[in-house]
Amino acid sequence: LKLRSAADKKILHAEYVAETVRQMVFAQYGQETYTRGLNVYTTVQASEQMAAYKALRQGIMDFERRQIYRGPEKFIDLPADPKKMEDAIDDVLDEHPDNGDVLSAVVLEASPRKVVVVRQNSEQISITGDGLKPAQSGLSDKTPPAKQIRKGALVRITQTPKGAWEITQLPEVEGAFIAITPQTGAIRALVGGFDFAKNKFNHVTQAWRQPGSSFKPFIYSAALEKGFTPATVVNDAPLFFDSGVTGGQPWEP
């Protein structure tokens, strides 16, 4: 007999999907949403949802690595007494919980070549080499105290695909991901932001932005439908229509 705990189950990060569904149902049923025992079925696919979640976070974190290091999130005094130090570390880590694979840690020692951090349960991790590059500006003697990585600093760390550790930071930028079946309009995956617990604003359904170049495929497809090909030559010389053509003011688009 094998007992399977809740911890054995994989977490499906579909928080933005669930909140979007809740809002839609609430708009129709009001407070009865929470008492009618409704079952809601979506077209979201678990495997595709997780792939979208990981892809969005990876893309944002890759962007974050190219940004200047903004400094530790907090600084604490580390008592000399080991038990008091452990309690102080546990308290600050509880106040700043892990964000997915972006983990919180407290610095025990720091130099331009090596940083030693500690996690809960006194787990120590040494970070060297490329793992220090994203935060190199925070390890200089000339760095302002508020941005310097030093003993007692609360920092973020993450593990690279190769298994090495590196210092990172929670991103300030946001992003969104939606995958739709064009034939039916079914939503296969939806991620409204980097972290639902941090920011519940859904950048898929609530953000209003200029479409930019994303509109170009519609123009290209309309041109292809009318017989244009990649080899078609289009005369893009300036146009000018005088008053005789317009019947009023000259017009130059």
Place the predicted regions along the sequence by residue.
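Glycine-rich, acidic and aromatic/proline-enriched surface loops and short helix-turn segments
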Residues: 17, 22-23, 179-194, 224-228, ...
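Conserved catalytic neighborhood of penicillin-recognizing serine enzymes
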Residues: 7-13, 183, 228-253
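Beta-lactamase-like hydrolase cores
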Residues: 63, 67-71, 93-102, 141-148, ...
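Active-site SXXK
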Residues: 52, 184-185, 203-234
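A short macromolecule-binding patch
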Residues: 122-139, 216
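Non-catalytic, structured segments within soluble enzyme domains
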Residues: 1-119, 253
